[in-house]
């Protein structure tokens, strides 16, 4: 496998099975105790070279769609790096981080977990300064036992937040609503509930598109989505809230969401 990787263009490899490289080996062979940990440590170092907004996206369902909507809302104003597909694991996240380049102005990283301690490890790699939690469901309930445990694990996404870090929570999710005032960071809620910071009103659909009025402290604006489903309204609200927080006007975010 290693010779094949080098032949395909790899300049160096981590290995935990070799004390030294074969005499005829090409490329750099780096002996480590744990290749997965070495990959994550290298990604964490690489991430530290970039002083840009990094948005982590997690939740039991809706992570990928929300990530795509956040990217759409921002891409008209920013050079965006986003997770491709669902590369959101302890292997996929580092590989996404390595795609960061100097041209990128913002990164949107999907972050998934299936066991206790995993989100904290991902947070140390990505070090998001903003994060979205879409909801708390039953995914991985076998490993984590209760939804409260799932919530606690998901919220480790803020472990490496800077003092100005911002968390965007689905205000329609009762488990997230219950903790929104006790978290050690700035919290913005979104949803259809009357007390959400970013709220959808007058939601309607014609079978091909979904339209609603976005109401937030900065004002109101009409939003049109080329998709159906009330869940997508929530995803779009999250995207608009993040966009405004990183300096993208709502009008610009609306254009991105429409397309």
Annotated model-derived regions:
Residues 3-6, 15-25, 132-259:
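Acidic, Mg2+-coordinating active-site environments of NTP-dependent enzymes
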Residues 8-9, 76-77, 246:
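Conserved dinucleotide-binding and phosphotransfer motif residues
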Residues 10, 27, 101-105:
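Short acidic/histidine-rich motifs immediately flanking catalytic phosphotransfer sites
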Residues 24-27, 76-78:
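Acidic, glycine-centered active-site loop in nucleotide-sugar glycosyltransferases
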Residues 27-37:
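N-terminal pre-Walker A segment at the start of P-loop NTPase domains
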């Amino acid at each position: 496998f290693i010779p094949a990787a080098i032949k395909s263009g790899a300049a160096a490899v981590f290995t935990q099975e070799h004390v030294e490289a074969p005499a005829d080996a090409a490329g750099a062979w780096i002996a480590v105790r744990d290749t997965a940990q070495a990959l994550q440590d290298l990604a964490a170092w690489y991430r530290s070279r970039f002083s840009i907004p990094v948005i982590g996206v997690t939740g039991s369902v809706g992570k990928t769609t929300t990530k795509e909507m956040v990217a759409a809302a921002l891409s008209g104003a920013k050079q965006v790096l986003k997770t491709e597909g669902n590369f959101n694991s302890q292997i996929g996240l580092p590989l996404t981080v390595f795609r960061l380049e100097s041209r990128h102005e913002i990164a949107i990283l999907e972050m998934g977990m299936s066991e206790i301690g995993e989100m904290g490890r991902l947070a140390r790699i990505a070090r998001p300064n903003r994060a979205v939690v879409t909801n708390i469901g039953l995914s991985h309930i076998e490993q984590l036992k209760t939804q409260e445990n799932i919530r606690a694990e998901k919220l480790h996404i803020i472990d490496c937040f800077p003092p100005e870090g911002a968390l965007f929570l689905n205000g329609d999710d009762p488990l997230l609503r219950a903790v929104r005032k006790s978290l050690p960071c700035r919290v913005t809620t979104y949803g259809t509930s009357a007390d959400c910071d970013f709220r959808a009103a007058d939601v309607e659909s014609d079978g091909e598109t979904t339209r609603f009025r976005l109401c937030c402290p900065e004002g109101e604006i009409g939003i049109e989505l080329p998709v159906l489903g009330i869940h997508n309204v929530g995803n779009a609200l999250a995207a608009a809230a993040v966009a405004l927080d990183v300096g993208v006007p709502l009008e610009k975010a609306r254009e991105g969401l429409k397309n």
